[in-house]
């Protein structure tokens, strides 16, 4: 048997790519293993988005390279964004790697593996990407999955390398996405998390108009699917039709991830974002008016080149005033090849970290207060299984908690706990609240 081990790094979109590669490998007769010392071929699917992600990818590649000396590994393959972006440089710097395959070559993973294991020889020709994946092998628990509705991006944010790595926006057809989700639901997936670089831009390239609402109308008809969650939406592409379908369809979680990055109009202009403070505030007001129990998540960049203390304070005050349920802050990362990397008035790492930490400390208080508002309420929770914290706790999530990104609900009391399994839905009364986690009992 040919055994393959895969290390998946980066965002949920990269995880979907990993699952597609595993599907190709399984179809080609490879055996998958999560024991690195047993793998004949090691694959590292890398992330190249920001410096921290690149450093982690390099570290994991070097670790995997040691398996060729100390384990049964015969070949090492590096895939993903880092390979796409720095293939020539990495070939020189990492001679232990047998093959580098880019974003558009992942459907050839089985062919590359067969060639390497037989010949111990690198090589992968650039090919036209397959739009539709084979049946995926899920990395995460089997009751939820990420579904990538497009690849690439047409936004040209000044700090971002994604368009140069993954190209322009390429939507998948509605019918093929629905077919994939039907297959996932038939295998026990209860929740899908829709991902793309910009989910709200979906369909414009192939249908000449944005079609996320139409896609959602098709997905809600899938009988065995219970939760649909929208991630990576853009404020400038949100329309009333989309808000109305989220509000009216029970299966669509009242949870929206809207990365706004900043609130100051001058900074947004330098970021080459197409949104404005007025537009962002208006969208949040419309969402909360139409969907009173909506959970909003966003991400911000602290210390963008030229950001003044006054602009930072404006962002801080906006976060305090708005009260997002979930929020992440990244210290600005200077990425080569981007417009922002050439901007003057680059800010020191010390100041960037301070500004990030100030907002995160504020957000921890907001998150705690938001969670305290849930004490005494009964929420439907999707069970993950026994908690990694303690076998005495069962772990689940309510609609306001996205997998991996947000906190969880710990269940420590109630009837029928011994009969609860991963993938079950149960009603949980919240009894305790912490900054990011909730505690409750089954009722």
Where are these regions (language model features)?
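Conserved, mostly hydrophobic/aromatic
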Residues: 157, 177, 194, 230, ...
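Generic beta-strand/beta-sheet core signal
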Residues: 7, 195-197, 231-233, 259-261, ...
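Short flexible coil/turn linkers enriched for glycine and charged/polar residues
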Residues: 139-143, 153-155, 252, 262, ...
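Conserved SAM/AdoMet-binding glycine-rich loop
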Residues: 75-80, 85, 90, 186-314, ...
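Terminal RNA-binding accessory module
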Residues: 342-443
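Radical SAM enzyme [4Fe-4S]-AdoMet core and its adjacent flexible, acidic
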Residues: 11, 203-220, 224, 270-271, ...
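Short, hinge-like loop/turn segments at secondary-structure boundaries
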Residues: 94-95, 117-119, 210-212, 246-248, ...
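Proteins enriched for Cys/Gly/acidic motifs involved in redox and nucleic-acid/cofactor modification
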Residues: 1-202, 241, 256, 278-285, ...
């Amino acid at each position: 048997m040919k055994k393959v081990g895969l290390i998946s790094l980066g965002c949920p979109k990269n995880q979907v790519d990993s699952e597609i590669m595993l599907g190709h490998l399984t179809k080609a007769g490879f055996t998958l293993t999560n024991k690195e010392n047993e793998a004949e071929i090691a694959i590292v699917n890398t992330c190249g988005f920001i410096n921290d992600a690149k450093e982690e990818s390099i570290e994991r590649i070097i670790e995997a390279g040691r398996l060729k000396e100390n384990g049964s590994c015969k070949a090492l393959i590096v895939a993903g964004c880092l390979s796409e972006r720095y293939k020539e440089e990495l070939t020189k710097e990492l001679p232990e790697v047998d093959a580098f395959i880019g974003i558009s070559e992942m459907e050839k993973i089985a062919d590359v593996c067969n060639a390497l294991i037989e010949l111990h020889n690198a090589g992968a020709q650039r090919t036209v990407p397959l739009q539709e994946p084979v049946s995926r092998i899920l990395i995460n628990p089997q009751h939820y999955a990420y579904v990538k509705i497009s690849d690439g991006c047409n936004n040209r944010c000044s700090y971002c390398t994604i368009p140069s790595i993954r190209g322009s926006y390429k939507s998948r057809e509605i019918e093929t996405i629905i077919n994939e989700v039907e297959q996932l639901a038939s295998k026990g997936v209860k929740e899908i998390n829709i991902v793309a670089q910009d989910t709200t831009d979906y369909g414009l390239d192939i249908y000449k108009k944005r079609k996320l609402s139409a896609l959602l109308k098709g997905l809600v008809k899938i009988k065995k699917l219970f939760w649909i969650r929208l991630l990576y939406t853009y404020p400038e592409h949100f329309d009333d039709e989309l808000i109305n379908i989220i509000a009216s369809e029970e299966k669509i979680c009242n949870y929206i991830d809207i990365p706004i990055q900043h609130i100051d109009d001058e900074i947004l202009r330098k970021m080459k974002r197409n949104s404005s403070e007025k537009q962002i505030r208006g969208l949040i007001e419309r969402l909360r008016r139409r969907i009173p129990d909506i959970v909003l998540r966003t991400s911000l960049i602290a210390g963008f080149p030229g950001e003044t203390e006054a602009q930072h304070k404006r962002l801080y005050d906006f976060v305090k005033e708005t009260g997002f349920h979930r929020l992440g802050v990244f210290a600005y990362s200077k990425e080569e090849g981007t417009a922002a990397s050439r901007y003057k008035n680059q800010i020191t790492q010390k100041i960037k970290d301070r500004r990030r930490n100030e907002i995160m400390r504020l957000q921890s208080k907001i998150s705690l207060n938001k969670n305290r508002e849930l004490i005494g309420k009964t929420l439907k929770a999707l069970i993950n299984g026994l908690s990694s914290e303690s076998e005495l706790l069962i772990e689940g999530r309510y609609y306001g908690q996205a997998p991996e990104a947000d906190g969880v609900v710990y269940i420590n009391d109630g009837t029928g706990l011994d009969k609860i399994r991963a993938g079950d839905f149960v009603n949980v009364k919240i009894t305790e609240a912490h900054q990011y986690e909730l505690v409750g009992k089954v009722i």
